[in-house]
């Protein structure tokens, strides 16, 4: 069964299958799964048969460290399903751990989050993969609406609220009023794009090759959107692109911020564009209510202050 814009409180299980992380919420228990959206597989034969050997955190630890015949897969890209089979296996694995081996869903109603910018075909794919994993009924919920409900915004009121949902693959800006999305702008850059910017900067400035896990560590440790009172440094280990040998460099937060700035500016422009297209009466509400940031990318140092200064909210 395929439905849209549901009453979220009628559903016992909520699933957010993100590009970077998969989160499962149960009404009676809260968040019960928060794992990386990664699957590790081993090739069995030349016909393409695969054996799944790890999910989530265990699989993420293998990224960049696998021998021949084993690879890590991210089943989602830019907020949508890229590998239907692996997505199904991943959801089934997490739900089996919750409900007991060999059982299907204990609860028939499951709400699954998707970016509001995805197509109807992409929404249907999310529902189909959830049903294939064992759900009796599945509906899709736009991520900005789910985020708004999660933080306690009364979305059914005649009042404008802006939610900026910044995950790993997409950044989505939604103006919400009367239970619906009035304006929606999205750009397929977010946390992963920040990591890629760091990887590119390290290659260009230091001829140093690093992996995505190292880039993420740099972003978390010394990344920022605005200058800091006390700038930070950290030692980064990688492979020298010139001679192929191990190499250690000292990296400053200033360099990282410069690398991240184009991506942050693109997100900022997306928010500005959405606000510019918002009806005047709702803009008045935004001045009073401010803008809500959600998603892992929102944790970048100084990001909320930068957006506040740039957008006068």
Q: Which residues does each PLM region occupy?
A:
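Nucleotide/phosphate-binding catalytic cleft detector across ATP-hydrolyzing
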Residues: 1-166, 174-291, 298-313
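Acidic, divalent-metal-coordinating active-site segment for phosphoryl/phosphodiester hydrolysis
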Residues: 171
